[in-house]
């Protein structure tokens, strides 16, 4: 497999790989499609700093001029946050975007692929994609789920995005053999909310336990990732029933406007932020910081074991 012409690893990340230090991968869709400017670039920088403060090296992943970048400079972060010509890349898009020299933010799926190519095993995001509501009619299921089934990277998030069908997303992951693990919780968190009423199959209390599960899974040759659900801190959690009603209203609006596919999630997140008068964006920012802290601790523990 020849990835050299396509992969560009930032010096800080390259040195950490060489010296076998803990590294945490970060996606870029949250920067270009998930939050408005200037919050997006501020959050990206703060997340990287949070990871550094906890003794790991951040590696924000994006595609710039057809190169898979593992670790971004300040200028590149700013470019991803402000440019209007940033595509959204999942697994199916990578060959086209690289071959044509385009710029793209990486989804959970694409970030997992690039992280694994670079040798990074821990990845932090806000929320994963999953089975959309009414997927039995639309067949709208995120490629993130298949990636979790096939790519050896542990993903830390605040649960599936709240706009999804959480029960079906959990069922899908279980069908494809992806361990779904609640960090200090028995319930699958619902992104903006700690509660969902849906139980997780396994609960763990420490980053060390998670690192041990990762090592055991891959020692056994069991292909695929691990999904770690880390609830948003209590003080920032939104009421589950209220946010669910807001989401239903946003989905109705999307249907009226015939918004589908890749455009749907950014539209819904933006509409929900508008309807909650900015509360959902605040929650989104805090849950990402919380996930970054946990991700750094898991990366350090996994580093000791491996």
From Swiss-Prot:
Catalytic activity of the protein: D-ribose 5-phosphate + uracil = psi-UMP + H2O
Cofactor note text: Binds 1 Mn(2+) ion per subunit.
Enzyme Commission number, as recorded: 4.2.1.70
Keyword Manganese found: yes
Binding site for substrate: 88, 108, 142-144
GO MF annotation terms: hydrolase activity, acting on glycosyl bonds; metal ion binding; pseudouridylate synthase activity
Single GO biological process annotation from the record: nucleobase catabolic process
Entry GO terms, CC: cytoplasm
HAMAP family linked to this entry: PsiMP_glycosidase
Subunit annotation: Homotrimer.
Family: Belongs to the pseudouridine-5'-phosphate glycosidase family.
Function, in words: Catalyzes the reversible cleavage of pseudouridine 5'-phosphate (PsiMP) to ribose 5-phosphate and uracil. Functions biologically in the cleavage direction, as part of a pseudouridine degradation pathway.
Protein name: Pseudouridine-5'-phosphate glycosidase
The species this protein was found in: Petrotoga mobilis (strain DSM 10674 / SJ95)
Upper classification of the organism: Bacteria, Thermotogati, Thermotogota, Thermotogae, Petrotogales
Gene behind the chain: psuG
